């Protein structure tokens, strides 16, 4: 196993992979193209964290959602999955604010369960 310049592990000459875990479980994704996965237990939508990590449109989505904590967790996993697929890691909260709207490189598949949400980011 080797690591890229941002610390993401990879296997030379092997498929791409991504691993994530939380209290509710573990998730692994493998593909021939860059891929990212994030799994999170449903987390509280803390107002300060919302403002630091979500753009204005996402903030409105969270605040108007019937279940704000689920919406926050959904958006968070989408952003994390893309960052993992890119292999760059989260550099700043500002990066998270603009990550999804400008992103046309990845197709996202989000699955919601009772206690957790996970998203897989597939390279287009």
Give a label for each model feature.
Residues 1-124:
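Core catalytic alpha/beta fold that binds nucleotide/phospho-ligands
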């Amino acid at each position: 196993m080797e690591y890229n310049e941002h610390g993401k592990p990879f296997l030379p000459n092997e498929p791409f992979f991504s691993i994530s875990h939380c209290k509710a479980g573990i998730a692994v994704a493998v593909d021939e193209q860059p891929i990212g996965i994030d799994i999170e237990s449903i987390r509280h939508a803390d107002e300060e964290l919302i403002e630091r990590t979500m753009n204005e449109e996402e903030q409105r989505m969270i605040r108007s959602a019937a279940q704000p904590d689920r919406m926050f967790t959904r958006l968070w996993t989408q952003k994390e999955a893309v960052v993992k697929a890119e292999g760059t890691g989260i550099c700043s909260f500002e990066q998270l604010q603009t990550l999804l709207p400008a992103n046309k490189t990845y197709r996202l598949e989000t699955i919601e369960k009772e206690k957790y949400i996970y998203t897989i980011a597939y390279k287009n």
